[in-house]
């Protein structure tokens, strides 16, 4: 076995250019499969996280119509009409062992923010200390909102780099004044960090985002009911359970009349996971089919070059048979060479696939996840290509008659 592998490597490296060109189809096919699987797994995880709260084991509890009234033309429900959340309910949720954090915050996507003649239309968050405990940010200029800011009506704001670029083309934003819905705010910090509401297809803070203390929210929007309730579980296994528990406690604080109109609920994560998985399977089948064509072409190339190799080594085969080598020895030697050739192509394809996936994450900022089963499967598949397409040349070599082979010039 080891001798067959040694001879295979010797043959491959004695014809380097020919071997590389032969492996090219296999390399491209395997690289495409690895890149596709890595990107799909990364996008799948990011999509699921974006739908439940964008990571950190957090899930959003939403206030929405009961029994589908909104869709059927019933009364519309707005966050402005949501009843205040009792402090006892907040304490009850936080006291549950499954809950690591809880934040009642505000989110608006319709605000117009001005500085002189420049305008931005960011996502505006009204937050407290609990929010930053759950979703840390990284300050690049200035400072964060302090505890004193967050517990007061200080009209201060943190903006991300997208807002800074839109409102302050010269890049100088600190201590400048901006106006939001007619209310002035002073910029105290600029941040850059991945946002929990960010689109999976966009880069870090491709969307404009800013933070204000939640106590100033009534000045901006005219109401004082949280639009978002985020629950952070102690582990990923408890995300759904913690969210349902929080929704139940919040609903217990509503009257029967309020429950008839609207209620708190959470997304079904299992349903989300199934939908994402279904989409990924369909997409993977489509792209996998395209990659398989490359592997098929690569396999045909392997068969062709092995037939050429058999022809070139006809006298060598004749000598070995004349010295007593059996058919299965000759067959196994050429089959081993084909498998070694495609296995090297498979390994290079895996490395190239990870390289392509990593490059795509730079061009289109999104994660990729290394899939060990995909790597193992790709290597096994590349070996299978060698066996399937190397079998015919190997059989041809093993059937050569010693006398005819020795006569070959």
Swiss-Prot record:
TM regions (residue ranges): 20-40, 283-303, 344-364, 372-392
Name of the molecule in the record: Uncharacterized ABC transporter permease YvrN
InterPro entries: ABC3_permease_C, MacB_PCD, Macrolide_Exporter_MacB
Domain of life, per lineage: Bacteria
Taxonomic lineage: Bacteria, Bacillati, Bacillota, Bacilli, Bacillales
Cell location: Cell membrane
Similarity comment: Belongs to the ABC-4 integral membrane protein family.
Name of one Pfam family that matches: FtsX
This protein's GO CC annotations: plasma membrane
Annotated keywords: Cell membrane, Membrane, Transmembrane, Transmembrane helix, Transport
GO molecular function: transmembrane transporter activity
Its membrane topology: Multi-pass membrane protein
């Amino acid at each position: 076995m080891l001798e067959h592998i040694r001879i295979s490597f010797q043959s491959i490296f004695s014809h380097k250019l020919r071997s590389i060109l032969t492996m090219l189809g296999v390399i491209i096919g395997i690289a495409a499969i690895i890149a596709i699987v890595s990107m799909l797994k990364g996008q799948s995880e990011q999509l699921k996280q974006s739908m439940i709260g964008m990571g950190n084991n957090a899930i959003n509890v939403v206030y929405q119509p009961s029994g589908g009234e909104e869709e059927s033309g019933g009364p519309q429900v707005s966050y402005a009409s949501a009843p205040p959340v009792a402090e006892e309910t907040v304490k009850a949720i936080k006291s549950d062992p499954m809950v690591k954090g809880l934040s009642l915050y505000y989110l608006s996507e319709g605000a117009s923010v001005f500085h002189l003649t420049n305008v931005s239309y960011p996502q505006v968050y009204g937050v407290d200390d609990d929010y930053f405990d759950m979703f840390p940010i990284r300050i690049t200029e200035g400072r964060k909102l302090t505890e004193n800011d967050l517990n007061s009506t200080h009209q201060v704001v943190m903006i991300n780099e997208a807002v800074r670029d839109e409102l302050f083309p010269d890049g100088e934003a600190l201590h400048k004044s901006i106006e939001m819905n007619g209310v002035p705010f002073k910029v105290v910090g600029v941040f850059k960090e991945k946002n929990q509401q960010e689109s999976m297809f966009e880069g870090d803070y491709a969307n404009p985002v800013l933070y204000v203390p939640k106590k100033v929210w009534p000045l901006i929007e005219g109401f004082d009911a949280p639009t978002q309730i985020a629950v952070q579980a102690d582990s990923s296994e408890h995300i759904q359970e913690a969210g349902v528990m929080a929704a139940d406690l919040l609903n217990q604080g509503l009257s029967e009349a309020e429950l008839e109109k609207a209620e708190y609920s959470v997304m079904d994560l299992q349903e989300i996971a199934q939908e994402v998985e279904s989409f990924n399977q369909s997409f993977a089948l489509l792209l996998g089919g395209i990659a398989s064509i490359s592997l098929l072409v690569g396999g045909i190339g392997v068969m062709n070059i092995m037939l050429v190799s058999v022809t070139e080594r006809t006298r060598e085969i004749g000598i070995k048979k004349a010295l007593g080598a059996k058919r299965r020895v000759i067959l196994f030697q050429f089959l081993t060479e084909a498998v070694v050739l495609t296995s090297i192509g498979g390994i290079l394809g895996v490395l190239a696939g990870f390289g392509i996936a990593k490059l795509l994450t730079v061009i289109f900022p999104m994660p990729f996840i290394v899939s060990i089963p995909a790597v193992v499967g790709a290597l096994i598949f590349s070996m299978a290509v060698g066996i399937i397409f190397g079998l015919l040349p190997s059989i041809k070599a093993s059937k050569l008659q010693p006398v005819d082979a020795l006569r070959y010039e």
